[in-house]
UniProtKB/Swiss-Prot annotation:
It comes from the Bacteria. The lineage of its organism: Bacteria, Pseudomonadati, Pseudomonadota, Gammaproteobacteria, Candidatus Pseudothioglobaceae. Pathway: Protein modification; protein lipoylation via endogenous pathway; protein N(6)-(lipoyl)lysine from octanoyl-[acyl-carrier-protein]: step 1/2. One of its GO terms (cellular component) is cytoplasm. It catalyses: octanoyl-[ACP] + L-lysyl-[protein] = N(6)-octanoyl-L-lysyl-[protein] + holo-[ACP] + H(+). Belongs to the LipB family. Catalyzes the transfer of endogenously produced octanoic acid from octanoyl-acyl-carrier-protein onto the lipoyl domains of lipoate-dependent enzymes. Lipoyl-ACP can also act as a substrate although octanoyl-ACP is likely to be the physiological substrate. Substrate binds at R66, G67, G68, Q69, I70, T71, Y72, H73, A133, L134, G135, G146, L147, S148. Gene3D superfamilies: Bira Bifunctional Protein, Domain 2 (3.30.930.10). This is Octanoyltransferase. The keyword Repeat does not apply. It comes from Ruthia magnifica subsp. Calyptogena magnifica.
């Protein structure tokens, strides 16, 4: 699996490239993880409702084709897009989501942070505050979109929405939970490698 660092990009550009990659790939195309940092943007999943936008701002709102509700992406957040052939891997969608969640939990363990899941709300949490979100699109057994992990960012835009559709859901970030100040690139590389290891262990 290849890891590609896209640097800082507008969301729409990367979303378009994900669709192009997924439509063009064949059974021999190598899976890829794209790491990226986005300019400020709200993205709505296919289950998102307008009432989850609580106030207006100059941050753009984009309706996407991923699963889930509304979330925020911005500078200081690690985003990893998972372009993976599930059929070739031999796992289902539910298992792939579990792989992503467990990879985030394992990354946070390396910073001595105990994270957990919530049965009624997707994502990864620390003391019931959301630190990571995820949402996938599956097309012909191939995934795109992926995960976002809050690292060192302005969290105030989350106050303008019900994150992932949940009212009064608290959010947190890595810099508030550890004195370690690894760079965004370092964290993205570490999480990507953990993801690759989890995928390899679950290959059938």
């Amino acid at each position: 699996m290849r890891i590609i660092d896209l640097g800082r990009q507008n969301y729409l550009n990367v979303w378009e490239q994900m669709k192009i990659f997924t439509n063009a790939r064949n059974k021999n195309t190598q899976d890829e993880l794209w790491t990226v940092e986005h300019n400020p943007v709200f993205t709505q999943g296919i289950s998102s409702k307008s009432e989850h936008i609580l106030s207006s701002s100059d941050i753009p709102i984009i309706q996407t084709d991923r699963g889930g509700q509304i979330t925020y992406h911005g500078p200081g957040q690690v985003v990893i897009y998972c372009l993976i052939d599930l059929k070739r891997l031999g796992v289902g969608v539910k298992k792939m989501i579990e792989i992503i969640e467990n990879s985030i939990i394992d990354l946070l363990k390396t910073y001595a942070i105990k994270a957990h899941l919530k049965s009624d709300a997707p994502g990864v949490y620390v003391d019931n505050a959301k630190i990571a979100a995820l949402g996938l699109k599956i097309k012909q057994s191939r995934t795109y979109h992926g995960l976002s992990l809050n690292v060192d960012m302005d969290l105030s835009p989350f106050m303008q929405i019900n994150p992932c559709g949940y009212q009064d859901l608290k959010v947190t970030q890595l810099c508030n939970l550890t004195e370690n100040r690894d760079t965004l690139n370092t964290i993205a590389e570490k999480l990507s490698q953990i993801l690759i290891n989890h995928v390899a262990r679950n290959r059938h």
